[in-house]
Amino acid sequence: MTSHTHAIGIDIGGTKIAAGWVDLASGNVLQHMQTATRAERGGQAVLDDVVGLVQSLISNRASHVSPVRIGLGICELVDLQGNVMSDFTIAWKDLPVRTILGMIAPCSIESDVRAQALAEARFGAGQDYDPFVFVNIGTGISSCLVQGGVPFAGARGNALVLATGPISVPGAAPFVLEEYASGLAVSKRFGVQTAQQVFDAAALGNTQALEILQSAGHALGSAVGWLANVLDPAAIVVGGGLGSTAGIYWGALVGSTRAHIWSADTQKLPIVKAKLGSDAGLIGAALSVCRQTL
C-alpha cells in the first residue's frame, strides 16, 4: 500500500471515547478501542486516556500503515484552525492538546458533529444528497450543513449549536433545546441514568416515559423544521445514539419536523437515519486529517 491511506480517528463524546485505525479509501475501521470519557476527572485525565489509546493503536498497527496521522473529533466548539474554544463538557480549552498529540504524530482537531457529517457525506447516508443537514442527537444535540461534501463551519467554526435553540412548552418557562430533547435531558426528566432506560420503560408502556420521548421528539422536530426552512436542504440525515432509535421519539421528530416546514414541497424531503452508526465520529475524525494536515 502507498502512504496516506490510513489514519487514527478519535471520537470524544460526553459518554465515551472511541478510537481506531481507519482506511481512508473505504471508511472501514480496522482496529477499534473504547473507554468511558469520565469528563468529571478533568481535561488532563481525558487527554491522558486519549494519548494511551493512540499509543496502543500505534504499537499494534499493521506494518504497511505508515506514516501515522491523528484526527480527533470532540463535542466542543472548534475554530477553523483546529483549536478547542469551549469547555462545556471536556475541559480542553486551556490545554495544549495539539502540541501534546503532535509530539506523537501530525494531529488535526475538528468538532464531532462536523466529523460525523463528513463521514456520512463520504461513506454514509449523505452520499446521495447535496446539500444535506446532519443532526446529531446523543448526550447533546448539534447540527451541520454539508454542501459539496464539505461540512460548513461558519466564519469562526461555531455553525453547529442547534442545542441552544430556545423552546417553549405550555406551563413551563422557556429553556434551550438540549435541556429538553437530548439523551442526557430525557434521562434527567425521567430520573434515571441513561436514555436507554427511558426507551426501555416506554417499550413496556410507561406513560411518563412515552410522554417524555414524544415531547422531546416534537421539540427537536420544531428546531429541525426551522433549519429546513432556512437552509432548504435536499435531505436531513439524523445520527447519534437517539438518532438511531425507532418508535415514538423518531416518529415525533419526523412528524414535528414536517409540520414545522412552511413549503409544501420541502415538507416531502427525505428524513433518514445515518448509516455509519457509532463509528461515524472516528471515521470522520480520521478523514479530517486530509483536510487539515496535508
Regions found by a protein language model. Give the residues of each.
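ATP-binding/phosphotransfer module of carbohydrate and carboxylate kinases, centering on a glycine-rich
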Residues: M1-R69, V78-Q81, T99-A105, A121-V133, ...
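Short, small/polar residue-rich loop motifs at catalytic or cofactor-binding pockets
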Residues: T15-K16, G138-G140
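Short hydrophobic alpha-helix segments
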Residues: H32-T35, F88, A155
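A short acidic/small-residue loop/turn micro-motif
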Residues: A36-R38, N158-V161
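A charged helix-plus-loop insertion that forms the helical arch/lid used to bind
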Residues: N83-K93
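General beta-strand structural signal in soluble alpha/beta enzymes
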Residues: C107-D112
